[in-house]
Design a protein with these regions (language model features):
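Short amphipathic alpha-helical segments with coiled-coil-like heptad repeat character
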Residues: 34-37, 104-106, 173-177
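A residue-level signal for conserved active-site and pocket-lining positions in enzyme catalytic cores
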Residues: 26, 96, 165
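Hydrophobic/aromatic-lined pockets within catalytic cores
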Residues: 31, 86, 101, 170-173
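A short, charged helix-loop
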Residues: 130-153
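Short beta-edge/loop segments at beta->alpha junctions of small alpha/beta modules
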Residues: 2-88, 190-211, 217-218
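Hydrophobic alpha-helical interaction segments
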Residues: 145-278
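Short gly/ser-rich loop at a beta-strand->alpha-helix junction or flexible surface loop bordering the NTP-binding
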Residues: 53-64, 71-137
Length: 278
């Protein structure tokens, strides 16, 4: 039996366990309704906290537990949104680290890595949805770089712990700075194994990230196992011909600063973990 009325239809979809619908679905369900009537009904439903505008033509369904918040946690709908937008994605950086239990505090943003051009960042009453464009993802994201995490609404594509750790070094500003990255790495590295990286990793992660992660793991965090794994990767895949870089690419190189020959890094900043009380 066809449901009469947009609100009953929205509630029926919620009862099915759905958390989002599209304008195209509404047009299909109510072909007799004009565009103006559909949008007017959606506006009233939004005012009554039945739905929230997730994107143009993409609406979030708000169960009673989320109605007062006027939104949903991005992790509950990001997979559906990115499929709606037709863009490859993975939850990355601090948001991925949190999923792996390595975030010392809940990130203020939910970070999604995707292809160029990225969607605009979006803020609601709960959190900010931040998109980081990675041009290497323009050709898609290999499954080897992802983990599919099961959630109550389906699955979430998340960068692997190894890709997450390396990406934190590629985008330190988005990740709270190098000292905060160091804090996250203390726990994240416990879930990493760099001895079995996919062959395609070099096409997606700059070699400088391996250098910085290797130095920070071995020389600061004293994780010699991870350090050796990363150094072996550098030797095998670059034949030792990687260039000298600065630890902090945003800071000038100190003329009298320490230089690590093993990692070919000019140590131009002093990193202290946020968890270090000294």
């Amino acid at each position: 039996m066809q449901i009469k009325g947009i609100r009953p239809w929205l509630r029926q979809e919620m009862e099915k366990g759905r958390l989002y619908v599209t304008l195209a679905e509404l047009r299909s369900a109510f072909p007799e309704q004009t565009e103006a009537n559909l949008k007017s009904s959606l506006t009233r439903a939004s005012a009554d906290n039945i739905i929230a505008n997730g994107w143009q033509g993409f609406y979030l369904l708000l169960p009673a537990s989320y109605a007062k918040r006027r939104g949903l946690p991005p992790g509950l709908y990001i997979d559906g949104l990115m499929r709606y937008l037709g863009k490859p994605y993975c939850v990355g950086l601090l948001s991925a680290a949190e999923i792996y239990g390595a975030a010392p505090q809940q990130p203020m943003t939910f970070t999604v890595m995707t292809s160029n051009p990225p969607p605009r960042n979006r803020r609601n009453s709960n959190s900010e949805l931040v998109f980081v464009a990675k041009r290497e993802f323009n050709k898609g994201i290999p499954d080897e770089l992802l983990r599919k995490i099961k959630i109550k609404t389906g699955y979430l594509s998340v960068s692997t712990p190894e890709v997450t750790a390396l990406s934190l070094l590629q985008y330190p500003k988005v990740s709270g700075g190098l000292s905060h990255v160091l804090t996250v790495l203390e726990e994240l590295l416990e879930t990493c194994d760099f001895s079995r990286l996919p062959d395609c990793i070099g096409e997606y992660i700059p070699i400088s990230c391996f250098q910085r992660l290797g130095y920070m793991s071995e020389c600061i965090l004293k994780n010699h196992t991870i350090g050796e794994q990363l150094h072996l990767h550098l030797i095998r895949h670059s034949k030792g011909r990687y260039q000298a870089i600065r630890l902090d690419s945003s800071a000038p190189r100190e003329k009298k600063g320490f230089y690590s020959k093993r990692w070919k890094i000019h140590i131009n900043t002093h990193l202290v973990s946020d968890s270090d009380d000294t």
